[in-house]
Amino acid sequence: MGALLKLSRLIDTVNEWIGKLTMWLVLAAVIISAGNASLRKAFNIGSNASLEIQWYLFAAVFMLGVGYVMLRNAHVRIDFISSKLSKRTNAIIDAIGIVVFTIPLSIIMINLGWPVFMRAFDTGEMSQNAGGLIRWPMWALLPLGFSILLAQASSELIKRVAFITGHTSEPFSVEHGKSEAELLAEELAAEAARHEQELAAGKAR
C-alpha cells in the first residue's frame, strides 16, 4: 500500500500543477473574448479563428481541469446526505462510484476519442468556417482529458481503499470541501468579527 500511496501523491502533484496551469487558460479566454467583442463593436473587425480559439480554450479548461476538480473533491454531491454519513461510509460509496462509473467511463471515452483525434491529425482536418483553425488540437482534448480523469480516479481509489483498510487517517489528500477562496473568505470574516469586537469593547469603556 505504501508504494500505491506514493503513486497517488505523484498523480495528485501532477494534477495540482495541471489545474493551476488551467486557471490561466480562463484568463486567456476572458482576454481574447473581450478583445474580440471590442474589435467587433468598435471597428467591425472579427475572424473565425479568434472566435474558435475561445471555444478551444473553453474546452481545454473543462477537459484539463477535470482531474484537479476531482482532486479537490469539488464535484457536486448531495451534501445533506453525505454530511450525515461517516467518513468510512462516504469513502466506501466513493470507491464504489469510482470503480463502477468513473474508471469505466474514462476508459470508454479514451477508446472512442483516440481514433477521432488520430483521424483528424492524419488528415489535417480543418474547420469548415473560412479562416478557421485546425481541428486536431480540440479533438486531442477528449482522450487527454479523460486520461487525466482516469489517473486522478485511480489516485482517489487508492486513498479511499487506504482509509477503509486503516492505512491512512483521512480519505482525502486536501482539505475537504474548502477552496483557497473559501479559506480566504473565512479569514476575512474572522478578521471583521475581531474588529467589531474591538470597536464594541472601545465603546464600552
Q: Where in this protein do the model-derived segments appear?
A:
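Alpha-helical transmembrane segments and membrane-interface helix-loop junctions
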Residues: M1-R205
